[in-house]
UniProtKB/Swiss-Prot annotation:
Species in which this protein is naturally found: Thermofilum sp. (strain ex4484_79)
Binding residue positions for Mn(2+): H75, H77, E88, H143
Cofactor: Mn(2+)
Record note on cofactor: Shows highest activity with Mn(2+). The Mn(2+) ions can be effectively replaced by Co(2+) ions. Shows less activity with other divalent metal ions such as Fe(2+), Ca(2+) and Mg(2+).
Protein family according to the UniProt entry: Belongs to the D-lyxose ketol-isomerase family.
Keywords: Carbohydrate metabolism, Disulfide bond, Isomerase, Manganese, Metal-binding
Protein name (record): D-lyxose ketol-isomerase
UniProt xrefs under CDD domains: cupin_YdaE (cd20308)
Amino acid sequence: MLTKELVKEAREKAIRMLEKACIAITDEEKEKIEVTDFGLGVLYTFGLEILVYVNNERYCAKELVMFPRQICPEHRHPPIGSYLGKQETFRCRWGEVYLYVPGTPTPNPRARIPEEKKRYFTVWHEIVLRPGEQYTIPPNTLHWFQAGDEGAIVSEFSSQSIDEKDIFTDPNVKRIPEIV
């Protein structure tokens, strides 16, 4: 559960990171930055700061701001009716991000997962993204990612985003945050 104070703190930190990366955003966009702890109550371990520029039935563009070593838990974007599920391209803008997808598990991956949560991380093929590098994730594909030691900023370009329908491996995850 997030407090209003923690959301404000995280939003301000995300804004500073965007400024450091020379990514200009408007005052209105600063207020729209979403902060989620995925309902796990440990924002700086499991969390994400998200600025949605546009999201409609045809396409979506976002900035994903990640604090040092922050993790977005394993999930997939399933088909919904005639919609195939979200296809997304992650492009690293700043920092370093470790993305995990199905494939041959990477020996000695860079990610660090709390021991009590490891059972909820099942794909271990590592893709390291540095500024200027990108990777496209097909619809309905399990994936998760973690920022490097300095954090990361990732631009996401995708088909329509319906975050509330994402399916997480960890049954304790709540994608839409509860703020008190």
